[in-house]
């Protein structure tokens, strides 16, 4: 289903299903023999959501033969995406750890989804974490974690707001201090924003950020939105999605239908133009650094993305 202005969703609908898919990958990585990250809460979200395509990374044993017939290299592709999510998660985990070590005591997660960093990471006692997402997404997460008796390891402030609306006002109302440096992350977010909304997002971050603030971004450049690349990916995935839908008895969204595919300003260039010092690492390099190289003949098994770090000049 294509996106529309002002659309919203339950966790098992539309963009919400992608948060469950990422939780599935984090859960699979956590249960693997040599996990790069640990997320003991991801499995609880999946259990609360029930059966669905979002459990794709959690096959116990071999995947169904019909799925393998539709996508012969299914296992390799699943492993590649699990590794991508694991390395991405570690990148942002480490970002927050480094920011805390540097003395930053405000953290902000934009479109937090089923992120459980408030519960699973170590934080300074005087730090605060703001999580921004739609009300129904935050409510699902809170209800699920409350049932597990989970307690945040940081002062945790959920901010129920749509990032297409006036979220800075909601953030300040939650106690965000524009006079103190902050650490921001935008993980798995940008393709789900229209180009103008992406620019406005970073304009607002710049306005809200005191000198010394930091931001980490999963960035998607021109190659990611290339129409020919997307067409090939969709064609390859059609047969797999059709078989999976027949097996599960429910529609499986084409994730590209949830993206805004228009040309947009590069996030790194945008921030650099406003005086932020920007460095970048490609996803290929990030995965390689953690020993998770993707097979050379499966270059499209993971997103063609890069991971940005930027700091606002003092």
From Swiss-Prot:
Exhibits S-adenosyl-L-methionine-dependent methyltransferase activity. GO terms for molecular function: methyltransferase activity. Its EC number is 2.1.1.-. GO terms for biological process: methylation. It comes from the Bacteria. S-adenosyl-L-methionine binds at residues 133, 162-163. Belongs to the UPF0677 family. This is Putative S-adenosyl-L-methionine-dependent methyltransferase MAB_3886c. Signal peptide: none annotated. Keywords: Methyltransferase, S-adenosyl-L-methionine, Transferase. It comes from Mycobacteroides abscessus (strain ATCC 19977 / DSM 44196 / CCUG 20993 / CIP 104536 / JCM 13569 / NCTC 13031 / TMC 1543 / L948) (Mycobacterium abscessus).
């Amino acid at each position: 289903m294509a996106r529309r202005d002002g659309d919203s969703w339950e966790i098992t609908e539309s963009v919400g299903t992608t948060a469950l898919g990422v939780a599935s990958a984090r859960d699979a990585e956590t249960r693997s023999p040599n996990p790069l990250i640990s997320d003991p809460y991801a499995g609880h979200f999946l259990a609360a959501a029930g059966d669905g395509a979002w459990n794709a990374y959690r096959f116990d044993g071999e995947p169904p033969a019909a799925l393998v017939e539709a996508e012969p290299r299914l296992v390799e592709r699943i492993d590649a995406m699990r590794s991508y999510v694991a390395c991405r998660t570690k990148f942002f985990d480490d970002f927050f750890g480094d920011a805390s070590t540097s003395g930053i005591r405000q953290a902000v997660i934009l479109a937090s989804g089923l992120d459980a960093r408030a519960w699973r990471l170590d934080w300074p006692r005087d730090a605060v974490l703001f999580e921004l997402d739609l009300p129904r997404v935050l409510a699902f997460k809170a209800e699920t974690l409350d049932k597990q008796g989970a307690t945040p390891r940081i002062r945790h402030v959920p901010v129920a707001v749509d990032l297409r609306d006036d979220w800075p006002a909601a953030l300040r109302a939650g106690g965000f201090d524009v006079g103190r440096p902050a650490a921001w992350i935008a993980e798995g977010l940008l393709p789900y924003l229209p180009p103008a909304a992406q620019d406005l997002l970073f304009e607002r971050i710049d306005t809200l950020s005191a000198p010394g603030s930091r931001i980490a971004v999963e960035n998607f450049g021109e190659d990611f939105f290339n129409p020919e690349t997307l067409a090939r990916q969709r064609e390859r995935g059609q047969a797999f999605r059709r078989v999976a839908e027949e097996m599960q008895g429910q529609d499986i969204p084409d994730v590209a239908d949830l993206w805004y595919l228009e040309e947009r300003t590069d996030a790194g260039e945008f921030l650099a133009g406003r005086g932020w010092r920007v460095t970048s690492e490609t996803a290929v390099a990030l995965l390689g650094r953690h020993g998770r190289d993707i097979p050379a003949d499966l270059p499209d098994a993971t997103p063609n993305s890069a991971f940005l770090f930027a700091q606002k000049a003092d």
